[in-house]
């Protein structure tokens, strides 16, 4: 039986700001873009959450909910540096670490001999080390499978942990809301609820073939999760799958011509990022993303081993066709990266954007 820990830092970006600037403590604080630049909230502290402020919320709306909200732009390099400290703490206990972001990770401590091999005690030790060495609190979930460890890490926040022993999984899973399963979003949860499926126990008694017919591969995965099954190992090597750049516009724009004026700057920055961080990786697709004034978004992609600037403009035209009269608040471009490195025979121009095309 595996021993999986999911560690999740508590309101990470905001916590770093409160650590470094004590005057923010006890006051509603958010890290994000300004309302003048039509930004969104990256994260916020618990004082702000009491007003209904949430991550990914438009800054303007967050400030309506909480007029006294303190907004700071964020210091990404500081967050990365602290994340490296935390990663070093993890490595004292196991080499099997799957980082999900700067502030959360899975750890497989099945073979760890420290603290008598107890995953519960190991999680407690990791959280103590993080607090002592970074001044930040972390929450943790402990379970025999990944998705339950992630669910558990949310159950005793902040600065706590929750353990689901193997023999308690059937009892725990039976009443678990489907909305708590990672990957089940609001729309999917509503579709499941319309079928009378609200808990894992409901799924356990529902005809399996009907679920698979209705939901395909997701239905098959849901059946497993509803029984507490998750055979996924940790992805210890997590090479980035894409490189992209996007911009939130100061004002909504509405026409293809206006979007085309934004593209050269995005493409130039994408070229810079590719040459800096993915120059030896094979490209397999190009992507254009639009976010509209109602915060819904669309992406158009084209699969190819070659990168063409003109293709970005063609994808943009296809994306604009989905506009339906809405304003455009965000525009982005990206390329998908394959797992393979480029071989020497491949034209090096395939790894960069040729801006003269």
From Swiss-Prot:
Its EC number is 2.7.7.7. The record marks 13 as: Substrate discrimination. One of its GO terms (molecular function) is DNA-directed DNA polymerase activity. GO terms for biological process: DNA-templated DNA replication; error-prone translesion synthesis; SOS response. It is found in: Cytoplasm. Poorly processive, error-prone DNA polymerase involved in untargeted mutagenesis. Copies undamaged DNA at stalled replication forks, which arise in vivo from mismatched or misaligned primer ends. These misaligned primers can be extended by PolIV. Exhibits no 3'-5' exonuclease (proofreading) activity. May be involved in translesional synthesis, in conjunction with the beta clamp from PolIII. NCBIfam families: PRK02406.1 (NF002677). This is DNA polymerase IV. It comes from Shewanella oneidensis (strain ATCC 700550 / JCM 31522 / CIP 106686 / LMG 19005 / NCIMB 14063 / MR-1). The gene is dinB.
């Amino acid at each position: 039986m595996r021993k999986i820990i999911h560690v999740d830092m508590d309101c990470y970006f905001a916590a770093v700001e409160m650590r470094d600037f004590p005057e923010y403590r006890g006051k509603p604080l958010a890290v994000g873009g300004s309302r003048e630049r039509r930004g969104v909230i990256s994260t916020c502290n618990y004082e702000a959450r009491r007003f209904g402020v949430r991550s990914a919320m438009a800054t303007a709306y967050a400030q309506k909910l909480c007029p006294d909200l303190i907004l700071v732009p964020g210091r990404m390099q500081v967050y990365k540096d602290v994340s490296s400290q935390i990663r070093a703490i993890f490595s004292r206990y196991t080499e099997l670490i799957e980082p999900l972001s700067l502030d959360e990770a899975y750890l497989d401590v099945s073979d760890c001999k420290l603290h008598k091999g107890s995953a519960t005690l190991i999680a407690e030790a990791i959280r103590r080390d993080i607090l002592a060495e970074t001044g930040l609190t972390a929450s943790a979930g402990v379970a025999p499978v990944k998705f339950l460890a992630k669910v558990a890490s949310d159950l005793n926040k902040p600065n706590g942990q929750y353990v689901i022993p193997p023999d308690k999984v059937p009892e725990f899973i039976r009443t678990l809301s489907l909305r708590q399963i990672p990957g089940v979003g609001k729309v999917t949860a509503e579709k499941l609820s319309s079928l009378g499926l609200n808990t894992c126990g409901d799924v356990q008694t529902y005809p399996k073939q009907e679920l698979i017919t209705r939901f395909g591969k997701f239905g098959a995965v849901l059946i497993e999760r509803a029984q507490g099954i998750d055979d996924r190992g940790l992805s210890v090597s997590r090479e980035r799958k894409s490189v992209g750049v996007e911009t939130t516009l100061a004002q909504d724009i509405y026409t293809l011509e206006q979007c085309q004026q934004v593209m050269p700057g995005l493409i130039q920055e994408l070229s810079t990022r590719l040459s800096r961080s993915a120059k030896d990786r094979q490209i397999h697709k190009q992507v254009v993303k639009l976010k509209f004034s109602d915060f819904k978004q669309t992406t158009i992609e084209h699969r190819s081993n070659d990168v063409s600037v003109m293709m970005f403009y063609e994808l943009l035209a296809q994306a604009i066709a989905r506009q339906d009269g809405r304003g455009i608040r965000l525009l982005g471009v990206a390329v998908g990266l394959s797992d393979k490195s480029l071989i020497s025979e491949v034209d090096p121009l395939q790894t960069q954007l040729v801006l003269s095309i």
